[in-house]
From Swiss-Prot:
Quaternary context: Heterotetramer of subunit alpha, beta, gamma and delta; only the gamma and the delta subunits are disulfide-linked. Alpha-beta heterodimer and gamma-delta heterodimer associate orthogonally, giving a cruciform conformation. This heterotetramer may covalently dimerizes thanks to the gamma subunit.
Name used for this protein in its record: Snaclec rhodocetin subunit delta
Covalent S-S links between cysteines: C1-C12, C29-C120, C95-C112
Keyword terms: Disulfide bond, Hemostasis impairing toxin, Platelet aggregation inhibiting toxin, Secreted, Toxin
Gene Ontology MF: a single term: toxin activity
Function description: Potent inhibitor of collagen-induced platelet aggregation. It acts by binding to the integrin alpha2A domain and blocks collagen binding to integrin alpha-2/beta-1 (ITGA2/ITGB1). The gamma/delta subunits mainly contribute to this activity.
Organism listed in the record: Calloselasma rhodostoma (Malayan pit viper)
Residue intervals of the C-type lectin domain: 8-121
Free-text tissue specificity from the UniProt record: Expressed by the venom gland.
Recorded superkingdom: Eukaryota
Subcellular location: Secreted
Main localisation: secreted
Amino acid sequence: CPLHWSSYNGYCYRVFSELKTWEDAESFCYAQHKGSRLASIHSREEEAFVGKLASQTLKYTSMWLGLNNPWKECKWEWSDDAKLDYKVWLRRPYCAVMVVKTDRIFWFNRGCEKTVSFVCKFYS
């Protein structure tokens, strides 16, 4: 992996402390290295590795992952089977943030327009 990037299972990772929106962070990752994107996480071990990197780099360990709009395929239905013909959703897309605490790691959704740190990943 290049200087300042860390290797894990054939991929290179780097946590950035700059605060960016999800879209700006994704663009920033893309510009860093060929194939680089916001990180996807595929196992508890990979999550722990990224969490350790974040703990070493960030004061507040909250960062964008590559997951966005996780519910866009969701089909909403009324419990009484009535037709969904009226909606007043707040039309804000959501993206995934990973938070690292001393005793656990968790993900939550956050408005993509918010600014947080982020982690990039590419296949080496």
